[in-house]
Structures are given as structure tokens and as C-alpha cells.
Amino acid sequence: MFSTTTHSVPYLYLGNFSRKPHYYSVNRTKLHGSAGAARLSKSTSTSSRSHDLVLDLRNLLSRSSASIQGMVERAARLNGILDRRLVDDVLAKVTSMLPSMRDVRVTLEESATQIGRVQLQNYQFEVSLTGAAGSVPTGANVKVIPTITPGLLRPLFSQQQLNQIRGFKTDRSIEAEQKRNPTMTSRLKNALANSPQRLDGDTPLQAEKLRRLLAKSEEHGFNKAESLKIAFAEGYLAAANSEDSPKSGKTMKYLKTLQTIVVIVVFLGIFLSFFTTSNGSVFRSIQLGNQVEVDPEEINVTFEDVKGCDEAKQELKEVVEFLKSPEKFSNLGGKLPKGVLLVGPPGTGKTLLARAVAGEAKVPFFHAAGPEFDEVLVGQGARRVRDLFKAAKARAPCVIFIDEIDSVGAKRTNSVLHPYANQTINQLLSEMDGFHQNAGVIVLGATNRRDDLDQALLRPGRFDVEVMVSTPDFTGRKEILSLYLTKILHDEIDLDMLARGTSGFTGADLENMINQAALRAAIDGAETVSMKHLETARDKVLMGPERKARLPDEEANTITAYHEGGHAIVAFYTKESHPLHKVTIMPRGPSLGHTAYIPEKERYHVTKAQLLAMMDTMMGGRAAEELVFGTDKITSGASSDLKQATSIATHMVRDWGMSDKVGLRTIEASKGLGTGDTLGPNTIEAVDAEIKRILSDSYERAKAILRKHTREHKALAEALLKYETLDADDIKAILNESQT
């Protein structure tokens, strides 16, 4: 029988040399390397029986002879091997192998790690057992194949390197590791094409040894293995000579220095180009951001383009007059106002008024947005305020417009978590009315959150004039609609009807409505915008986009028809209700149907009767569902109606003094314990009971109207199912026909 087993332990090799293997004989044993402890083991194979000696040769290199003997004997006892002759023979053979391995005395745990030009490789053992099948092997041949003789390794390493026993790192191993897992610095160096590094070690000594080898090769012939060594030596010396050249080293050094300087200059130039303005000041753009001066010649907006806010426009016209003729007022001892604060809901034209001031005043105009003063860096907001006012003072008389001023002028805080949060507003307060006066600089501020502003900012001397820019009334809406209609092609438009139907619309809403109407007309292929397009656009702004078709579920459509019909019936037969405009069961936005109203005239105050009528109309939808389909079939479609009705009832009780039980008082919402204004339990109970009573009474009134006009309600619902949308004239005709 014959078997061969190959095992390996770490060893070193240089280049691609090889040599003839050593042969050792071990009777009845098999020797191989292992990462575990040394041991002798028995094989239980039926075809042959053998005793295996498993040794960690890396461990053996660091052990003494006595220690090796003890380790082998202990392994034999643990495995039941009592043949002393066998143990001694194994120990002798192992001991005879160690000197050749101790010549190097370098053991590493990780293969393929480079040390200079030396790379780890496996030390091969091939063990061949001899003997008959079924009997104890008569002997074994151990073939040890080192990849290079220790004699050639020794000159290439210093004594300190050869004496290392455990795993270690050198410049070469670190370089190899960096090649496998390059860092950001390594990648940058490779991108910049750094010059090659010199090899570590004693180069003159290595070169001398290799020169001797070459000289010897000229006198004697060598086999292929020796020829490979000589070829390696020639290449190594050629590389060493080129690296040792002083001229080459200096050239590479100069090139590397020049390369570094060029890279630094390029990066510095790119960095400075981002933060240098046309006048040469560095970091100016960081400090001022978008706080730029606006050229009045580029602004084509005047007060003629501002409609629907005559009171605010008149206040700003006076400011413009101050700027145009300051001596007219200074002769009488008057002073220019320090600031004008524009307050109002979003979309009412505050920014448009500021643009009109810039276009009319013909003085330098600076614009900044409040959020631009907020920065991550501490102190940047205050610095931007200083820079803005410094630039404005140099161009006085001028106007500074700060949009969304509540971002920078919010109430100061005492929070220890934000100790620097007040720096920006403090700087703004100082610039507007501090120790140094800003003659000729007027500040325009715009906000829709006046209550959030610091009180010190609102006092006279900072914002002397406060202008309320509210939503336009009926006349204002007509003016705005007339202005925007001149910019499109349109048919005959009923401005009065359109203005009444857009109650509560801001100037921005009206502009958007007319733009939507123009888009719809273009999509329909019409040459001009008609009243129908404008009404469709208004419904889209109010209720959302219309869906293509009604719901495929007929039961849902029937419930929606009776629900919307309930709103219409209650509104039609309630005296103080708004007049009906349109009823539809076409889904729009989140709602499945909608009932629209148009007030007869502008309301500047609301009476209690009108509020109760509005609540009755809102309750009409849920009341219709209950009366027609039963209490088990009421739906969630009344959620919006109930929310609005609850809001009205709550305001009537808590804010408007319209409850006899609660009395003539206002009751603010409780802010919680510890705030000093917590409501008592009796008050809370009385308020809740009164709100519930008002809602219940409204619901009963709505049901009473629907019970009285059941026939009209049914006819209106059937018409909605047939025609989907009905206007005021259609509704009136259906109800009158049902009564006859």
C-alpha cells in the first residue's frame, strides 16, 4: 500500500527559486504541520493502521529541545502509544529537522504578507507511508521542500529582522496592506503620481553579496535554479544602481516638491474664486448672502399696479413722499419714519407693495429675507445685519426691505440651550434705533405673524408705522379682477357676480384663479376666456380639481345626492342663510360633493341669527342621511360639516358672548397646570354643555325643515343623480315645481 499526504506550515521564500528537497525517514509515523498542539494519534482505517504525529512546526521553532521532547512524549501518552522506541525515533527525526529551520528563525502567522522583497509561502512536507495492507506500516519518508536555502536568506536581512519570532509588520507589509485597503491619503498620493519609494535595508551590503554571486557565476556553470538566482541578482542590482543615482534622486525630489506647490496653488485659487467679489473683497459673499441692492430702474411695478389695499397704499405713498422731498417735512421739524411694518395674511400683497415703493421712490433699495440671517456659525446673523445697514448708510436716503421679518425679529428667549440665539435681533434693534442714528434709512418689514415679533421691535422709533394689509373687500376684489382680466383675452364677464363669489380670496388667489381659467380655455380650444371658465377655476381653487366622472358605486352616489340635497334644502328655506350658487355630486378633492353659496353683499360683521343659520345649513347633510337611510346608515362624509359647526358654536360661547348660561365673557383655552389661567371644572363643564346644546338645537332645526319638505328633498336628489351639477336657477325651478 502507498499513500501520500501533503501538509504545510508558514515559511519564507525569495523570488521564484526552488531547490532539491531534503528526505527524512520516520519509521511507522506520518509527520505533518498543524495549527494545533503537537500530538500522536491513531488511524482507525480498515485498510491500514498508522500512528500520526501532528506537530505545529511554528511552535517548535520557539521551543527548546527539552520542551520538544516533553511535548512529544505527552502527546504519545494521551493517544495510548506506549512504544518507547517509536517515540524516540520520532523525536530524533524531528530534532534533526529543526536546525535547518532554525537558521531563519522567522515565523509569521499570515501568508502573502510582504517583508521587503521577501514573501511568505508554505513550507511543504510530503509524507509517504510504506507497508502491507492490514498491518502496521514499516516506514515513512518525509520530504521537506523549502523554497530557498537559509544561506541565501541570511545576507538579505539584518540580524534584528532574522531574530523576530512572532508575526510583525514592516514597511513592506504596511505598504502591501495599504495597496489592498487604500486610505484616502493613499488614494490622493496615487492620484498625484508620487515618485517611487526607495527600498529599505542595507542596499550596499546586499549589492556586494549579489556581485560576488555574479562573479562566481562567470567562473562556474550552474543549473536552471542557479541561473534564476543570477537573473534575479542582475535585476536587483540594476534597480539598486538606478535608485542610488544622486542625479535621479535629486530630480525626483525637485519634481515632487514642484508638484506639491502646483497642487496647493490650484486648490487655493479655486477656493478664493468662490468667495471673492468683483471689487476684490474676500468673503463678502459669505457675509451678505442675498442681501443685495436692487436697481430701481429694473423695477416696473408702481402703485397703479397695486389694487385692493387702498389704506396700505396711501401709507406707503407718504413714505415715498418723505424720500422724494425730505426738506418739505424737515422744514416743519418733522422726521422721516424709522420703519414701516406691513402685517397681513399670506397673499395679500405685502411684497408687491414693497416693490411698488422701490419703483416709485427712485432711491437705493436693499432687499433681504429674514431666514438669510440664520446661520450655523455663531455671530454670522448679527454680522450680516451690520453689513446690510453699513451698506445702506453709505447710500442714504434709501429703503431696506426685510421680508418675513418674524424669522429674525422673533421674541427673545432666555433658554440656556441657545445662549447666542438673541444676537441677531439685538443687533437689528441696535441698528434701527441705537446709539448711532441712521438718518435717511427707512426699514420696511413684512410679516404674517405679528404676535411672534419682539415688543422692542414694535415700539415707535423702530417701526413707527404699522400697516394692516387685509384680504380685499368686494370693491377691492373687483379692482383686482379687472386688473388681471386686462392681461388676458376674455368675453363679457360679470365682475359683480365673480367678486361676490370669491369672498375671502386674497390677491394671490384671484390671480391664480384667472390664470387657471386661461389655462382651461386653452385646453378647451377656446379663443377667449368665458365666465364658465372663471367659475370652473374658482371651484377648483375652492374645492380642488374635479374628477373625471362620479363614483361607480351607485349607492354612494345616492347617499351623496341626498346629503348635498339636505344642505341645499335647509339653506333655501332658512331666512338668514347665504343664497345658493351651485350643488354638485361630482367629487372634488377629498369631498364627494359640494354645495356652494354666494353672499348677496359683503359682510363686515356676523349676527347671531346668521351664525345659527350657517350651523343649520351645515347640519342639513347629516340630518338628511338619518331621515332617509336611518341612523345605522349615517356616513363619515359629514365630518367637515360637524367640524365647522363645532367651531362656530365654540366661538359663540367662548369668544363672542352669545350664550346666556356662560354670560358676557371670553374664555381662553386652558394652557395647562402651572400657567395661572387654568379654568375651573365647573366652568369647563358649563362651556361644554352650552356648546353641545347649541349644536343639538341646530340639528333638530335642520331635521324639522327636511321633514317639512320631504318631497322637494327627494326631487332635488333625483335631479342631482341625473344631472350631477345644478346651479341656483335649476334648484329654484325644481323646488317650485315640486311644491305645485
Swiss-Prot record:
Enumerate the UniProt keywords alphabetically: ATP-binding, Hydrolase, Membrane, Metal-binding, Metalloprotease, Mitochondrion, Mitochondrion inner membrane, Nucleotide-binding, Protease, Transmembrane, Transmembrane helix, Zinc
Parts of the chain that traverse the membrane: 257-277
Report the top EC class in one word: hydrolase
Kindly indicate where the leader peptide sits in this chain.
none
Q: Known InterPro entries for this protein? A: AAA+_ATPase, AAA_lid_3, ATPase_AAA_core, ATPase_AAA_CS, FtsH, P-loop_NTPase, Peptidase_M41, Peptidase_M41-like
| Cross-referenced HAMAP family | FtsH
Residues exposed to the Mitochondrial matrix side: 1-256
Name the UniProt record assigns to this protein: ATP-dependent zinc metalloprotease YME1L
* Cofactor(s) needed for function: Zn(2+)
Q: Name one GO biological process term.
A: mitochondrial protein quality control
The cofactor remark states: Binds 1 zinc ion per subunit.
One GO CC term of this entry?
i-AAA complex
Q: Which family does it belong to?
A: In the N-terminal section; belongs to the AAA ATPase family.
Q: Which residues bind Zn(2+)?
A: H563, H567, D641
Which superkingdom?
A: Eukaryota
Q: What does this protein do?
A: ATP-dependent metalloprotease that catalyzes the degradation of folded and unfolded proteins with a suitable degron sequence in the mitochondrial intermembrane region. Plays an important role in regulating mitochondrial morphology and function by cleaving Opa1, giving rise to a form of Opa1 that promotes maintenance of normal mitochondrial structure and mitochondrial protein metabolism.
EC number, UniProt record: 3.4.24.-
Could you name the active-site residues? E564
Instruction: Give the location in the cell.
Output: Mitochondrion inner membrane
Query: According to its record, how does it sit in the membrane?
Result: Single-pass membrane protein
Knockout consequences:
Viable but lifespan is reduced and males are sterile. Mitochondrial proteostasis is disrupted leading to crista disorganization, mitochondrial unfolded protein stress and impaired complex I activity which increases levels of reactive oxygen species (ROS). These defects all likely contribute to the increase in Dronc-mediated apoptosis in neuromuscular tissue.
